[in-house]
C-alpha cells in the first residue's frame, strides 16, 4: 500500500508536465487561426491517421474586433470576455471540434489569454467578436464581469503604466504589456473568473493549455489558478488526469525572470531552442551542425522534461517575440525542413510543429510592415482550409504539417519514442548523423559538398525507405532506398544540391 501511495503521489506531481496525448503520439501542431470546423475535419482526415498527438488552437474566447489595421492576428490576444465566440467559431462549433478530435485520439490544447484584457486605448462599444459591450477606459468588461477593482493600475509604479524596463521583475508582472489592461491576479475573484473559463474548457474535453504571457504573471498567481482547475473529462481521459500546462516565458538569458521560476506549474516554452537551431542551420556566427552533438541541456537549455520546443511560433515567424532573424520559417523551406527534421528526431523536449498562413511580407528598413496581417479572409470572415488534389492546402494556408518531410518525421518521433540518442557522427563541419537506439537513424548534409559515407545505424539488417524523399506504400518505396547490412552499417549519399539534403529511416519504414 505504501508503494501504491508513493506512485500515486509521484503521478499527481508530474501530471501537469504530461501532455495527455494518446499512447505513442509524441507531437502537437499549432493550427494557427484555423476555424473549429476545419480543425475537426483535419483531426479526422489527417492528424489522427498520421500520428499527430494534438492541436494547439488559437484563443477561443471573445476578443476585440480591430478594424485599423483590418482584423490583425493579434486582436485575438485582446480579450473582451470568456464567451467561446471568435472568428474561428462559436461554442457549439468548438464543442463539436473537441468531441470529434478526442474521438479519433487527437487532443486539443487551448491558448489561454489570462494575464490581461484588451488594450487601454481601444474605444468603448461593441466592436467584439460576440457583440459584448466593453469600455477599456473605465476598465469595464460587463460580460465577465470585471471592473476597475480587478486591474493592476494601482500597483504598477511606472510613469506610463506600461512595462518600461525588463530588468525590473515587478513591473514586468504588475504593469501593462504594450498597453494591455493587466488583471489583478492576486484577487480571488479574478482567479475564480479565470478558473471558471478554464474549467468550462476542461469540462468540454480539452487536454491542456498554453498559458500566454506567463512571464507577465507571478508564478504563485498561476499556481493559485491551476489549483482551482478540474480534472480532465473522463469520457476521454483516465480518472484523475490533470490538464497539461505549458507556459509562454521568453527567457533568452540576461533578465531577472527565468524559465525555472515557472517549473512548479508545468512545462515552459524553450525559446532558446529555435533561436539557436536557426543560427546553426543558417551557419551564422561560425556555428556548425557538428556542435549539435550535446544539443539540449548541454547548450544551456532547461531540463528536457520541462521543455516545450519548436522551430518557430506564430510570434517569431513574423519578427515578434524572440529569436530575431535567425528564426527559420516556411519562407526558408529547405533549411526549415532540416530544422524541423532535426527537432523531431532528437529526444530533447516535447515538440510542437507550426502550421501557418501566407501573408504579403513587405520589408522596410529590415522590418515587415505587414507583420500584423490576419488569416486568409473574405471581408474579415476566415477562409476555409481547402485541400488540393496533391494533399497540400489552398486559400493561402501553408500547412507545413502536411509537408511530406515534416509529417513523416512526426511519425519517426512516434516510432523511436523512448529510445536513446546513439551512433552520433559528424565531419567537424555540417555533415552529421545520429540514431535512436535500434529504431531510427537520420543523416544531414548541410555542407557545400557531397556527403558519401558508410555509417553505423544501429538498425537491424534490411532495406529501408527514406521517409524524407518518399513514402513506404504497400511495401514499396517512392523515395531513396537504404540498405542496412548484417553489421548495422549502411551507405548514405547526399548531394549538397539535393532538394532535401537529409535522409531518415526507421523500424516502420523497413520494406
From Swiss-Prot:
Chloride binds at residues 210, 313, 352. Its EC number is 3.2.1.1. One of its GO terms (cellular component) is extracellular exosome. It catalyses: Endohydrolysis of (1->4)-alpha-D-glucosidic linkages in polysaccharides containing three or more (1->4)-alpha-linked D-glucose units. The modification Pyrrolidone carboxylic acid is found at residue 16. Disulfide bonds join 43-101, 85-130, 156-175, 393-399, 465-477. GO terms for biological process: carbohydrate metabolic process. Monomer. Belongs to the glycosyl hydrolase 13 family. This is Alpha-amylase 2B. The gene is AMY2B.
Amino acid at each position: 500500500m505504501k508503494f501504491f501511495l508513493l506512485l500515486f503521489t509521484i503521478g499527481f506531481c508530474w501530471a501537469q508536465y504530461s501532455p495527455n496525448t494518446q499512447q505513442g503520439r509524441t507531437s502537437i501542431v499549432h493550427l494557427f487561426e484555423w476555424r473549429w470546423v476545419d480543425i475537426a475535419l483535419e483531426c479526422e482526415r489527417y492528424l489522427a491517421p498520421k500520428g499527430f498527438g494534438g492541436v494547439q488552437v488559437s484563443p477561443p474566447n471573445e476578443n476585440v474586433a480591430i478594424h485599423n489595421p483590418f482584423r490583425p492576428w493579434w486582436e485575438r490576444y485582446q480579450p473582451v470576455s470568456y464567451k467561446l465566440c471568435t472568428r474561428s467559431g462559436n461554442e457549439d462549433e468548438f464543442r463539436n471540434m473537441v468531441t470529434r478530435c478526442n474521438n479519433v485520439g487527437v487532443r486539443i490544447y487551448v491558448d489561454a489569454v489570462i494575464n490581461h484584457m484588451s488594450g487601454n486605448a481601444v474605444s468603448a462599444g461593441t466592436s467584439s467578436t460576440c457583440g459584448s459591450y466593453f469600455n477599456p477606459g473605465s476598465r469595464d468588461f460587463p460580460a465577465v464581469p470585471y471592473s476597475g477593482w480587478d486591474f493592476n493600475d494601482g500597483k504598477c509604479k511606472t510613469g506610463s503604466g506600461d512595462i518600461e524596463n525588463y530588468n525590473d521583475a515587478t513591473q514586468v508582472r504588475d504593469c501593462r504589456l504594450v498597453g494591455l489592461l493587466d488583471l489583478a491576479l492576486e484577487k480571488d475573484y479574478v482567479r475564480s473568473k479565470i478558473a471558471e473559463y478554464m474549467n468550462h474548457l476542461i469540462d468540454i474535453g480539452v487536454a491542456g493549455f498554453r498559458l500566454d504571457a506567463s512571464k507577465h504573471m507571478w508564478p504563485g498567481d498561476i499556481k493559485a489558478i491551476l489549483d482551482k482547475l478540474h480534472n480532465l473529462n473522463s469520457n476521454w481521459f483516465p480518472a484523475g488526469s490533470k490538464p497539461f500546462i505549458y507556459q509562454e516565458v521568453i527567457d533568452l538569458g540576461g533578465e531577472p525572470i527565468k524559465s525555472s521560476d515557472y517549473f512548479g506549474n508545468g512545462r515552459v516554452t524553450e525559446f532558446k531552442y529555435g533561436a539557436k537551431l536557426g543560427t546553426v542551420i543558417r551557419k551564422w556566427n561560425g556555428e556548425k551542425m557538428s556542435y549539435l552533438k550535446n544539443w539540449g541541456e548541454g547548450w544551456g537549455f532547461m531540463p528536457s522534461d520541462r521543455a516545450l520546443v519548436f522551430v518557430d511560433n506564430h510570434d517569431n515567424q513574423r519578427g515578434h517575440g524572440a529569436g530575431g532573424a535567425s528564426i527559420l520559417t516556411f519562407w526558408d523551406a529547405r533549411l526549415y525542413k532540416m530544422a524541423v527534421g532535426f527537432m523531431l528526431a532528437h529526444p530533447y523536449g516535447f515538440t510542437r510543429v507550426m502550421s501557418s498562413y501566407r501573408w504579403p511580407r513587405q520589408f522596410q528598413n529590415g522590418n515587415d510592415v505587414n507583420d500584423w496581417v490576419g488569416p486568409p479572409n473574405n471581408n474579415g470572415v476566415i477562409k476555409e482550409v481547402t485541400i488540393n488534389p496533391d494533399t497540400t492546402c489552398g486559400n493561402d494556408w501553408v500547412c507545413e504539417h502536411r509537408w511530406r518531410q515534416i509529417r513523416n518525421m512526426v511519425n519517426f518521433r512516434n516510432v523511436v519514442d523512448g529510445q536513446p540518442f546513439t551512433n552520433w557522427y559528424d565531419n567537424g563541419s555540417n555533415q552529421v548523423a545520429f540514431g535512436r537506439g535500434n529504431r531510427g537513424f537520420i543523416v544531414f548534409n548541410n555542407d557545400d559538398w557531397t556527403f558519401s559515407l558508410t555509417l553505423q545505424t544501429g538498425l537491424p539488417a534490411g532495406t529501408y525507405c527514406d521517409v524524407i524523399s518518399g513514402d513506404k506504400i504497400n511495401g514499396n518505396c517512392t523515395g531513396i532506398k537504404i540498405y542496412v547490412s548484417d553489421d548495422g552499417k549502411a551507405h548514405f549519399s547526399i548531394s549538397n544540391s539535393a532538394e532535401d539534403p537529409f535522409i531518415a529511416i526507421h523500424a516502420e519504414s523497413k520494406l
